[in-house]
């Protein structure tokens, strides 16, 4: 039997298992769910709505033409875009008491992400509250400012008990037991 030649040490690091995460902790594009992609496109559309003041129909048409939209859950995208824009004032009213600053001082990216989170917590009851929080934190890590994800997490984590009290209490009770 012949022995396998040994590789010199230090020539190549051992292969790491694939986790679907990049070195920064963000998920790789190939590992994102259809709904995660829908949230990304909704974020882009809501950002355009806040910053560009474009009409929802123009934003919708533009977003659907972007590369990769075909891989997104278009129904969830429609729900988020229409819901967040139609209920912007109500969503802001939910979020405002939890903020430590004015909306004018919050990045439009974080503002849009918090709209998505508040809307999903309130209307998308098929999505567990922790998934809503995690998805919004991931969006903030990928698209927001340096510590924007911490702010988004704090605000939405404070909002969740008022919108999903039974689910949050049951979930938090399990972790303490």
From Swiss-Prot:
Keywords: RNA-binding, Transcription, Transcription antitermination, Transcription regulation. GO terms for molecular function: RNA binding. GO terms for cellular component: cytosol. InterPro entries: NusB-like_sf, NusB_fam, NusB_RsmB_TIM44. GO terms for biological process: DNA-templated transcription termination; transcription antitermination. It comes from the Bacteria. Pfam families: NusB. Belongs to the NusB family. Involved in transcription antitermination. Required for transcription of ribosomal RNA (rRNA) genes. Binds specifically to the boxA antiterminator sequence of the ribosomal RNA (rrn) operons. HAMAP family: NusB (MF_00073). NCBIfam families: nusB. This is Transcription antitermination protein NusB. The lineage of its organism: Bacteria, Pseudomonadati, Pseudomonadota, Betaproteobacteria, Burkholderiales. The gene is nusB.
């Amino acid at each position: 039997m012949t022995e396998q030649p040994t590789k010199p040490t230090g020539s190549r690091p051992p292969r790491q298992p694939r986790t679907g995460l990049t070195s920064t902790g963000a998920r790789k594009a190939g590992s994102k769910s259809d709904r995660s992609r829908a949230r990304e496109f909704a974020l882009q559309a809501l950002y355009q709505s806040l910053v560009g003041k474009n009409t929802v129909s123009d934003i919708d048409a533009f977003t659907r033409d972007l590369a990769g939209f075909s891989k997104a859950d278009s129904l969830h995208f429609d729900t988020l875009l229409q819901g967040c824009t139609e209920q912007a004032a109500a969503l802001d009213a939910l979020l405002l008491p939890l903020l430590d600053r004015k909306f004018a001082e919050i990045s439009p990216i974080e503002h849009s992400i918090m709209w998505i989170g508040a809307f999903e917590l309130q209307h998308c009851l098929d999505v567990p509250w922790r998934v809503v929080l995690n998805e919004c934190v991931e969006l903030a890590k990928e698209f927001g400012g340096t510590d924007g994800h911490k702010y988004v997490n704090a605000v939405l984590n404070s909002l969740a008990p008022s919108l999903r009290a039974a689910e949050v209490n049951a979930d938090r009770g399990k972790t303490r037991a």
